[in-house]
Amino acid sequence: MFKIFSLFLCTFFLGSTVNASNPLEAGSMSVCDCQPRDGGTITIATDWVLPYPWKSSEAHTYITPIYGNLYIGDPYNNELIPDLATHWEVSKDKTKGTFHLRKGVKFHDGTPFTAKDVEWSLKLTMKPEAEGSDFLMGAARLKELKGAQNFIDGKTKDIKGVNVIDDHTIVLETAVPNGQFFDVVGKVYILPEHIYTKYSWEELPKLDWMSPKVRVGTGPFKMEEFVEGQYVSYVANENYWAGRPHLDRIIFRLFAEHETGTLAFEKGEVDVLSFLTAEEVKRFGANPEGNIMLRGTPLSPNYINVTDMPYFQDKRVRQAISYAINRQQLIDTLIPGIRDPMDTLFPEGHPMYNPNAKRYPYDPEKARALLKEAGWDPNQVVDLSTYYTSQEALDWLAFVQMYLTRVGIKTKVRQMPWPDLEKAGQAGELELWLTGYSRDVIGDHMAYFGPEGTWNYGKYNNSKYHDLMTKASRSGGEELKKIFFEMQEIFNEELPAIPFWNRTKFNMVKPKICNAVEPWTDQHFGYRNFENTFICEDSKNVISVRPKTPTGLGHPGYLSP
């Protein structure tokens, strides 16, 4: 599946450079020998656009040019950079955050941005009827606002812990101390209250969100046109608060198949190609045309999620599935060099990796023995579902199916679009399903394994594990590491899901695209830096570099109130 990556200007980088001739060492930013210049269009390949963007976290990849956030996440060091909030303070007891909003900002329709828009956007994220909570994997943590549950349940029209002081000041208060909560708030995109309050929460998903009159934000680009099955186009926001972006237009061109998008990239019809397959990494690595390869995403695991069907209740069945998968063979055969085997929450080498947690090396005999002990019915056929669509995904699905068949678990592969898979999960119709994530580790775990998690289709509910997740959301440093170590010991014993590899993300950009960046981490949704990308047709020296931790990212306007 294609993903679209964010772009930004950064002037701090390492002296040594790398390029696509050695793709596995590729840097994460393209740097040209040109001065920034205005004008032009970039075309980015994607394979889907969700009409109602708040329904899925996947949507953020093509809406970041449109909307603003209170602050954005520095993708290199996870520091927070002011955006629609110029600054903020968190109380000593970590229960109250006061946000001071940027003055003079206007939405695309010319309406001034105020604190009421922040309040309404928080409500959208939390109100189940609006189907907006799926958009933010960390939405579960917003429930820690005072009075949040009463609002969610319809008992109150407002959230007690959200207080608008004036047009440019808003105070958020949590029920319990939680310093990390105020980081999560930055992930909420800010929408204009005045456009949507005329509709009920239930009506919002039914609006034409591809209309320039509905998709309105404060970002550097404005919605221009949507042609179903073909493309989505954005144009520069001439009145963007931080200054007009360099590009005139961004086009997200839709391809039903990844391979078709690759062909378009090779023909020069698109400028950005994302989520390269292993074969493409090898082929483009020769770099015959000077294309720039960008590498990122150090933590991006894939899992086989297990639902709460009666035949999966015995943990020995779940453990058998983990023993059944030959992770290293799967990687070496299909995608050498761009995946690492993984059988716990973090890959080996990650600072949070616990080497003492229960391990699951490839052992089909042990898998068969566990299934026999658990009374597994060898005639039982279970669905193995996914929303991934690429040939690479089909290949590794076939391998997983083969491994499970060898130990006595019969499966049937089901491919479906993400919205359909989500509906199946909500209806209790999923059995085994493959997915992945790469952003907020704590928020993801709450969404997948918390008792009220949006995607906890397995209904996993371990009170100790949930308590640890809650503690993790309020911790940092060595304390957080200890918590994650303990979480891995529980997770690897019970296996509410089966990790099998950690993927590395590779993208390609044409050499004329300057300041294109693949972040090293996806921990924050909010980075939005398309305004600093520019086109230089006559660049003689385009390189891929590894930036140092920058002192400030994005438009220079981010650095001052």
Model-found features: residue ranges?
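N-terminal lobe/hinge region of extracytoplasmic solute-binding protein
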Residues: 22-24, 28, 43-92, 123, ...
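Gly/Pro-rich hinge or "lid" segments in bacterial periplasmic/extracellular proteins
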Residues: 74-75, 178-245, 249, 259, ...
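Ligand-site clamp/hinge motif
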Residues: 124, 209-212, 237-283, 410-412
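Surface-exposed binding/hinge segments that line
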Residues: 119, 134-198
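A structural "hinge/loop" feature
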Residues: 45-64, 84, 111, 133-134, ...
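Alpha-helical secondary-structure segments
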Residues: 43, 114-123, 167-173, 177, ...
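Detector for C-terminal structural segments
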Residues: 24-26, 227, 324-353, 388, ...
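Aromatic- and charge-enriched surface segment that lines or borders ligand/interaction sites
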Residues: 87-137, 171, 261-264, 311
